[in-house]
């Protein structure tokens, strides 16, 4: 099983824009407690505890899938192909999001992303 945050919008730019603040708040809160210890540094080695990653770093490390339904589906498909993924838990709610946004993200994932994954 894998847990990954998602932000699905009609365009990559809009998804990035709507994910940034919530992502940054999430990591300001949890980064100091070592939650980022799974991130890899530029040297290919795990980073030390306390990293507060940028949205770009999280996207590069694929801890959050951001983009259009097609782009998010490509990220899920990559995990499935690389890891033989059978179960995926999505984290559809970023700090500051209203409840309705989480519901929207779950609905979009099921109706727009899942059908694109083989």
Regions found by a protein language model. Name each.
Residues 1-85:
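An alpha-helical appendage that flanks or caps ligand/catalytic pockets
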Residues 9-11, 96-99:
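Flexible loop/turn segments at secondary-structure boundaries
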Residues 93:
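Flexible loop residues that form catalytic
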Residues 97-118:
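C-terminal helical cap(s) of enzyme catalytic domains, especially alpha/beta-barrels
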